[in-house]
Regions:
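Active-site phosphate-binding/coordination module
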Residues: 1-64
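Short, well-ordered beta-to-alpha junction loops that form the rim of enzyme active sites
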Residues: 7-8, 87-89, 189
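Conserved A3 ("GATE") glycine/threonine-rich loop of ANL adenylate-forming enzymes
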Residues: 11, 34-36, 61-65, 107-111, ...
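Gly/Ser/Thr-rich active-site cleft segment
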Residues: 15, 50-166
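A glycine- and small-aliphatic-rich helix-loop capping segment at beta-alpha/alpha-beta transitions
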Residues: 16-25, 75, 123, 178, ...
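Short helix/loop capping segments that flank catalytic or ligand/cofactor-binding pockets
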Residues: 38, 121, 145-146, 174, ...
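Catalytic phosphate/nucleotide-handling subdomain of diverse soluble enzymes
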Residues: 151, 155, 159, 164, ...
């Protein structure tokens, strides 16, 4: 069988070389600690450049400014940071030992993701690329579950794990948001409207 992980996001979780969390996860748009970093990045790059590069404006939802906040305000944590993960990629790492992230989630890491080339591309010098996970598509197989994860979870050693994605993307797919014009409203701790449009 296969396991697919979907968890809250986008968020930021710095981990050390063993994959252990160095601090509590920094949540999505409800966490506004990186307000100054958003302003600074918009001043240095121009909002239109950021939007064209990553497909999103910088907001409290964006992970890139939060990484910059971490560097500026918690250098002790930043110094130990091996990878920057999300809740989904943290769980996938616990299951497989591999650091991966799906493209949909990566697009929320502005200004670190190039939406046209579909790759990491830090146009602002916010984060060394080696600290970011390998990019995959959410349905790609990352690999088999590790023996220790099988023991912890009770899953079979024959289980494979997909890259997975964040909660909103999984929910959109589950309710049929697949074509231009489709949309959904997601109610949770916050409310999101997700709509597919046929434009770039």
């Amino acid at each position: 069988g296969a396991v697919a992980v979907s968890a809250i996001g986008p968020c930021m979780l710095p981990v050390d070389e063993t994959g252990e969390a160095l601090t509590n996860g920094v949540l999505y748009g409800v966490d506004t600690r990186a307000h100054k970093e958003i302003l600074d990045l918009n001043d240095s790059l121009e909002p239109d450049v950021i939007l064209a590069h990553g497909g999103n404006a910088l907001t409290s939802q964006s992970v890139g400014p939060k990484i910059l906040w971490l560097q500026r305000n918690r250098p002790d944590i930043w110094k130990k940071t091996h990878k920057i993960l999300t809740s989904t990629s943290f769980i996938v790492h616990r299951l497989t030992g591999k650091y991966v992230m799906d493209h949909y989630t990566a697009a929320s890491f502005g200004p670190l993701y190039d939406i046209k080339k579909q790759t990491w591309d830090d146009i602002a010098g916010v984060c060394p690329l080696e600290k970011l996970p390998k990019l995959m598509w959410s349905t790609d197989i990352v690999g088999p579950i590790t023996e220790s994860a099988a023991q912890e979870t009770g899953l079979s050693l024959d289980t494979v794990v997909t890259c997975g994605t964040i909660d909103a993307a999984s929910e959109a797919i589950s309710v049929g948001v697949r074509s231009a014009g489709d949309m959904m409203v997601m109610y949770g701790s916050t409310i999101f409207i997700i709509a597919l449009v046929d434009q770039q």
